[in-house]
Amino acid sequence: WRSIIKNNQDKKKLVITARVKRLIFTISILYLLPVIVIKNTWLFTTIEVVMSYLNPLVVLIAMFINMPVEKLVYLYYKTKAQNKLKSMNKLKIIGITGSYGKTSSKNILADILNIKYNALPTPRNLNTYNGLIMTVNNHMDKFTDIFIAEMGAYVKGEIKRLCKLVKPKYGILTRIGTAHLETFGSQENIQKGKFELIES
């Protein structure tokens, strides 16, 4: 019973992000439109019934409507992160990638560096493009001396894209294995993809 209670306590609370809130708002508007526009009761009821059966389609339409807004929001946060990195001239950036051992290597390195410096590792497994943007915007401040960026990839070119964003001066390559072989296509592609950090 103790383990069950502990597991329940460890469960994360549901977090509704700003993007989800915008999507819910657009979906609500789509469902309210018939109420505002259509005066015929029979036609209104018919449309509402049809829409209730086509919920997934309504969500897809809402997502399509929100696409321009989401692109602007994404561009805003990306530019904000890039400007912050450019403004921190003394910041040293270390990139870490590999098939296995990225997170543990990152955490060990952060513990060592934090003895003398103020090192910021990417939290948890935020090793994607959006994860790095989020880390820079939400966790980095003027007191950060070293940024340790964990970099994950599923296809060739992804590590190169991450390097263009944060521009690491140093790189650490951990073990390369067969993780994500189905998306990379071959062992050779995995090696090439991971070595993009060293080449950058």
Where do the language-model regions lie?
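Phosphate-binding loop of NTP-binding sites
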Residues: 1-26, 30-200
